[in-house]
């Protein structure tokens, strides 16, 4: 049966089209408030688990978060389905639901000590991305689901690899060479998309090497600085890190260049605890930004759009102006899923997906989304602070900074807080390279959390054994 035939059959079942339209209107209007309330409760739980050590109580919170996620997913799908009566939406929903349930159950089954908060947030952000990308572009949704499913399956083994392979800190120079070669590859076979020559197209799929290299890059900096922070070693790692950044600047991928630079400074400061390095780095970065503004016309264009999007609305400022229109139109509660016009925003499903979310789901939902992203960062930092191995500690902190700074650049750009840098919102925006690298990031953090839990359990067992031996000797 074709789509039209299925729609006609559904209409016949419910009586007539007016009833469907009325049902849809009621559902859209009520659902946006229900979704906001549910997401607010989920967000509250993201922070409530940081207080107290009651494991049983926290497990109840995690299970409640899962129920909230599945409920929001169902409501959003119901609204989108009634909007078009396209049965394909139901098929995609079932596939998404199967993926979310499988990943949730599989990770907990394989890793008993897995951080349920990290897992829950990863799945919640993925789900929001599925809903919004499906609302904007069905073909892109299918691709996103394929990429997410594949990397979630592969990512299941990443914590296992981290647990059983303890030599990651020995290959600092190797990581640097691999990263530089991968970034430089675009000069040979790269393509220019959206003004930046940082894409490689293979079999119809476009990917950004910088998204994958940013993981290797953190391993490189952490491996080097975990061994020494003497001046000569800092100079060496700074030069190699600078090569990464300069290649990205040459490719006109300034958003990624900023992320790499800030990540390097963060790891350097934490490793050395030298405020002088941080001050010198920030001064050098500011000077480089001024130079980039005068050298690159596309940087000048973005700064102009940031300073006065309304005055350049027919040219450079069109994208930012449409983004602000969408956010303003949505207000606090949103237009309702499917009721806005996010397609008027250029690249709404990638760089500007936060604007589309704000328009249809409202500012309250968008603020909760920001808070969930922040809770991810806090959780990453908490995990890093508990880790005793210096390399893993620096790696976790570096990945945390990469994640939160990318969120800042994305949301700051679409809200006119800073000039747009062309980076995506992790796990939410469409993009195979982005979703793959971010899930890998979450899995690495998960692996380090699991490893640390096992080491703590082993230490406690050893301490209990030693205490028992001492008691026996006293007798």
Language-model-detected regions and their locations in the chain:
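Hydrophobic alpha-helical transmembrane segments of multi-pass inner membrane proteins, especially
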Residues: 74, 86-315, 355-415, 440, ...
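Membrane-helix interface and helix-disruption motif detector
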Residues: 17-31, 81-92, 136-143
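N-terminal signal-anchor/start-transfer transmembrane helix
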Residues: 32-51
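N-terminal secretory targeting signals
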Residues: 22-34, 109, 458-475
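Transmembrane alpha-helices of multi-pass inner-membrane enzymes
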Residues: 416-461
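TM-adjacent membrane-interface loops and short helices in multi-pass inner/ER membrane proteins
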Residues: 309-350, 354, 363-365
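Extended repeat-based interaction scaffolds and adjacent low-complexity, acidic/S/T/P-biased segments
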Residues: 52-59
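Short, strongly hydrophobic alpha-helical membrane anchors
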Residues: 1-24
